[in-house]
């Protein structure tokens, strides 16, 4: 979509989101929405998995209709769930932040598509700090430990290494 201008909003001041309360995550996400709407964004994609899991429904159902009804807001959960459900046969592991696991969004959405799937949600609180601290050896070890537990594994966290 080269005909569009893009704005990247990265909330580095409040990271990581995974250990925050749902109220904090919603507040941070609403702040981002207001900023992006003030910049005349017509489409906003919440690329943070935790913010999508915790705040997207509220934003789509309550905030946007009142505050900016012409704006479309999407997240990362539904596209991922659609692919995972198509590829999974019996059991899926969801490895994510504590806040994402608490939301049960992946379990709910996967069961809408395939109610027979067995889904295990696992919080990975050590993974984000390992990546943010550039400890890629530890991050790789943790990912392997989580992934080895499941035939189908969804790994959900989007931290960035810190300089």
Please name every model-derived segment.
Residues 1, 49-54, 97-102, 158:
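Gly/Ser/Thr-rich loops at beta-strand to alpha-helix junctions
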Residues 1-32, 98-139:
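N-terminal glycine-rich anion-binding loop in soluble enzyme alpha/beta folds
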Residues 27-37, 73-91, 100:
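Hydrophobic alpha-helical segments within soluble ligand-binding/sensing domains
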Residues 27-40, 141-153:
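Short, well-structured alpha-helical segments in soluble
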Residues 31, 36-57:
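Beta-alpha junction/loop-to-helix N-cap segments that form part of ligand/metal-binding clefts
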Residues 53-87:
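Glycine/small-residue-rich loop that forms an oxyanion/phosphate-binding "nest" at active or ligand-binding sites
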Residues 156-163:
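Conserved small/polar residues in nucleotide/adenosyl-binding loops
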């Amino acid at each position: 979509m080269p005909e569009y201008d893009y704005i990247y909003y990265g909330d580095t001041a409040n990271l990581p989101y995974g250990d925050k309360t749902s109220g904090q995550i919603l507040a941070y996400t609403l702040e981002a929405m207001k900023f992006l709407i003030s910049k005349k964004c017509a489409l906003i994609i919440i690329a943070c998995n935790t913010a999508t899991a915790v705040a997207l429904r509220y934003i789509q159902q309550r905030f946007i209709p009142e505050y900016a009804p012409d704006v479309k807001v999407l997240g990362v959960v539904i596209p991922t769930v659609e692919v995972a459900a198509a590829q999974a046969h019996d059991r899926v592991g969801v490895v994510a932040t504590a806040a994402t696991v608490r939301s049960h969004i992946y379990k709910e959405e996967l069961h809408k598509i395939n109610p027979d799937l067995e889904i295990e949600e696992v919080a990975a609180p050590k993974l984000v700090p390992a990546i943010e601290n550039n400890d890629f050896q530890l991050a790789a070890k943790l990912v392997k430990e989580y992934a080895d537990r499941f035939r189908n594994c969804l790994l959900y966290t989007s931290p960035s290494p810190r300089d």
